[in-house]
Amino acid sequence: MTLTIDHAKKLVIEFCATYPVASTISYKIRETQEELYGPQATREAAGTILGSFRPGRGRAEFAISNFRDEDHFRRTLRHEVLGHYGINTFNPAEKRAVLEGVIQSRNDPGMAALWAEVARIYPQLTDSMKAEEVFAFACERIVSPIRGNVAEGARSFRETCIERTRAMQVSDLINLTSMVAEGLHDR
C-alpha cells in the first residue's frame, strides 16, 4: 500500500493520541525528501531519508515517498519522536549520562547488533551521535500501548548511567526506552 500525506497525518494523530506529549512538537510531512531538505537532497546525493527530528525547531519531518507501508512509517515515528525527541526530555546532564552508558555498552553481545546497524548506516557520526541512534533504533521496537515498569527504567538509569556500577545491557536499554515512552504517554 502506498502511503499518502493524508494517511500519514492520520497516523501522526493516532500516535499523538497514544503519546500526548508528542502533540507538543510539530510535524512536517512532504511527498519527497527534496521537498523537505531542498533540491540538493536527492537520494543519489544524500541517500534515502525517511525522516528526522530537529530539536531546535521541535519538529519531526517525514518524506512519505520513502516508506514501504504504514508499519514502516509508524516505526520511523517511534524512532524520531520516542527516540530523538524522547532522549531530549532528559536534562542535558542526564542525556549525556544515557549516551555515555550506551557508548560503554557497545561490546555487550545484546547491543552489538544495534551498534553494527548504526555504524553501517551512519559511519561518519561521532560516538555520541551513534549512541543516540542506538537509542532511537531501540525505540522503533516499542509496542504500544506502553506499560513498562518505570521503577525498572529508573533502576537501569541509575545503575548504568549515573552510578555506573555495571555496564548497560540490552534489557537496560529496553527499560530506558520504555520509561521514556511511558513518560510521553502519561504526562
Predicted region positions:
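Zn2+-dependent metallopeptidase catalytic core
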Residues: 2-26
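Hydrophobic (often cysteine-bearing) scaffold residues that line and stabilize catalytic clefts
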Residues: 4, 8, 74, 78, ...
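Flexible, glycine/threonine-enriched loop-and-boundary segments that flank and lead into catalytic domains
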Residues: 29-52
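Short pre-active-site segment immediately N-terminal to the catalytic Zn-binding motif
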Residues: 57-78
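Acidic glycine-/aspartate-rich tracts in secreted/extracellular proteins
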Residues: 68, 91-92, 142-144
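Post-HEXXH active-site segment of zinc metalloproteases
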Residues: 71-75, 86-123
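Pan-zinc metallopeptidase signature
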Residues: 116-187
